[in-house]
Regions:
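Terminal targeting signals and extreme-terminal segments of soluble enzymes
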Residues: 1-76, 82-147
Length: 147
């Protein structure tokens, strides 16, 4: 997978809680923004999803908090695909303090491709699935053809 960041941003004072660090609701929001940048790299752009009547839904999300982020910290998220199936992808985001390089949090997601009209899961188009397979993390090669 490309090593370009899927999210870059800043921790603002209003995003911090009474303990003085970024509140968990903002971690979730920043990871969500990274999701959409990752999906766009695979060809799942907002316009293609609208035009095709498709969508993506998170069905599992596991966050591990490693280090706190404070107001003014610059945040960067890098993402990698771990598994590609006919109707779903599993991927990992690493949120880092861009200044120190320390991992602040990780988030593993399972995202399912949806037919919005039928309101149920749908297979990825072959071009999307092939693009996803090409972006698989090299450490996870046995999962490239999972179904």
């Amino acid at each position: 997978m490309e090593t370009d960041a899927t999210y870059r941003g800043t921790v603002y004072p209003w995003q911090c809680d009474h303990v003085g660090h970024m509140n968990i609701m903002w971690y979730v929001g920043k990871f969500d923004e990274a999701n959409w940048n990752l999906f766009a790299r695979l060809g799942l752009t907002p316009s293609s999803l609208r035009e095709s009547g498709r969508g993506m839904a998170a069905v599992q999300q596991n966050i591990a908090y490693k280090r706190e982020l404070l107001a003014g910290d610059i945040v960067e998220i890098r993402s990698r695909l771990l598994e590609v199936r006919d109707k779903s992808v599993r991927f990992l985001h690493e949120m880092r303090n861009a200044e120190t390089g320390e991992i602040a949090a990780t988030c593993e997601f399972v995202g399912v491709h949806l037919d919005r009209k039928a309101r149920k899961s749908a297979p990825f188009a072959p071009a999307i699935r092939n693009a996803a397979i090409k972006h698989l993390d090299p450490a996870e090669p046995e999962l490239a053809q999972a179904t």
